[in-house]
């Protein structure tokens, strides 16, 4: 089976710009004057590429003449897969233009409308299929950053109506892409490929365009972002100008395309192949614990802050003794395999405790009571987890100026909910170094306890603070290393793929996709 882009060099139903991109191994986006983005492809007039072959691999030198940008990439063909890797240290910017993004084989396996049966697979939440149909009218493509948005670059806010005082219960945020894969199927159980983003995933996005969105073709691709354009404040009144990162992010973008056929050529075959890959890489290991009974997960809220007229109060919800009674009652009803996560146990409870504190609120009980609850669950085959959120805090939990990471625009990294009736509609994200210190304190003060670690599992963000500039790539590395050092069991919520190996209990796995109009299956 021959995989390619367009059947024709110049498609009659596609303009020259898109036709050139569809027939290019790689294309680039670059930033010119006034930070305006433009695209260059190898099919554009004047651009060139040469290949240096050696057995089953080649070094390809691409020169985008009009853009004034050149780079090299490596292609290697082995058995059932093809790997393409952008060599970042070969990038040359000969004019004032700066490299923004690189697209790898953007139209590989493209299908015009429904001329071929099949679908595109995207890592949207639980995974989504976009079946080939006649062209439709859509307002957006699927364009999601792998491992979620970056709070240091992307504005984070909750989906909601602009005219409402509170959030719309029928509107949901888009699902995250926690796995760096996508794929294409040409006829179920006939031919397919699965693309795995192996390097640079934290800076990549999966982009899928259904027929009718710009062109009549269905196509999916990975895009590697090397620079961001952003608004930069120039005075205290809030005036901004558009600018771009001076230096590109330093990484090689690498994608491997695994070609599948016959009974393996569908989304189930992709899942089996990916499971094989992550098992062989040590990312996914068999859990040594074998449960004879289906485990029950209980998330208990110990206490919560209560808004007051002058001073905030505290509302005790579940004391340690009451938690023991709940567990004992379940045990007497023959439910023994219980995992309990205890949130708000620190002084002043949920949203009220100081960031990083590890002291138990005395209204809930004492450390002896906590140890008794821990032992009770363990003796009956269950687990007890202390809930900790080292990532985010509100304005009363810490000094924003000293604790919050900064965005590339020098604003505080934050997430704002549209519900203005909330006590704390905005939460801030701590410096990655503070996240590490907070987790280290928890491990030191409670060495015998398992931890329910909130948000670390599916959030990575850079920090552009003056004295602590940390890239998204570096943040991923240090947070992963910190989690791996926690030797006790850990609960992680919908964790990104790189933390699967350090996850004892996986909670809140997505059961659906974002339900875009063009997504046909979940």
Task: Outline where the language-model segments fall.
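Carbohydrate-recognition beta-sandwich/jelly-roll modules
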Residues: 1-317, 324-338
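Conserved aromatic-histidine-acidic binding/catalytic patches
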Residues: 74, 262, 311-318, 322, ...
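An active-site-proximal structural segment forming one wall of the substrate-binding cleft
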Residues: 266-267, 273, 277-278, 319-322, ...
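Aromatic- and carboxylate-enriched substrate-binding clefts and catalytic-loop regions
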Residues: 337-522
